[in-house]
Amino acid sequence: MTDAFPRGRFVWYELMTSDPSAAQSFYTQLTGWATKAGDLADQPYTEWVNGETSVGGLMQLPDEAKQQGAPPHWLGYVAVPSVDDTLQQAQGLGAKTLVGPMDIPTVGRIAVIQDPQGAVIAVYTPTGDAPGHDETPGVGEFSWHELATSDHAAAFNFYQALFGWVKIEAMDMGPGGIYQMYGRIPGQSIGGMFNKPADQPGPPASWLFYITVPDVHASVEQVTQLGGQVLNGPMEVPDGDIVAQCMDPQGAAFALHMVKPSA
């Protein structure tokens, strides 16, 4: 591994859904993304394209995932120098391998794991350069990666060992407990982790990915108009940005993020 390899960077975001055609219509209208056919040979695959850059993919929720009780969901892929070494390490830390490892021609090697608290994430070693970047995300890009879990301290230790993530800042949310921000690079947050309230519905641990939009208030109206749900927000967070948590018409959770306007 060279210093240039982006170990621990989220590089791809994949929507597995019960109705790819309907989901494509929803997100292209909401985010302005275009789409193009992907490279998977064994099944239909669509790439989300923001400007000139592919930011993720769209596919039918696999039957085996449905049989395991998985609902439509977004799956984040994290770059690692070796998928096989990462799987071995993850298993030693208490994770389960759900899919793979497997090679995708011209793309790279991937696997899907479930962390010790139950959240699902994918690891990816690209054939060429890894997608994504570490600069401030622009409109239409994924900007924040949030883990709701049963034990955020244990979860951070797991991901720190696996991906090299570092703690950035811990924010006291009062009755909500600690919100632990983290990043790949000291001083540069890419997400947060917190303990999920016991009375909150859904799985015990899950990832939520935030998409940058120019106007979150207009976007949440559009979410509703397009058949989705606004679960929480819009609300201002401590740095002045505005966010909202949502669900698409097929039931996949996602979030919207508007950067604080410049003074």
Residue ranges and their predicted role:
Residues M1-P6, R9-S18, T46-V49, E64-Q89, Q91-S143, I168-P186, ...:
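Vicinal oxygen chelate
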Residues M1-S21, H73-V78, Y124-F156, L162-I168, ...:
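N-terminal beta-strand motif that seeds the catalytic metal site of vicinal oxygen chelate
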Residues T2-S54, G92, G100-G108, L147-S189, ...:
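Core segments of cupin and vicinal oxygen chelate
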Residues E14, A23, T31, A37-G38, ...:
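Ligand-binding pocket scaffold of soluble enzyme catalytic domains
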Residues A23, W33-T35, T53-G56, K66, ...:
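Short loop/beta submotifs within extracellular cysteine-rich repeat domains
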Residues N50, S54-P62, Q67, G76, ...:
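DNA polymerase sliding clamps and clamp-related checkpoint/processivity subunits
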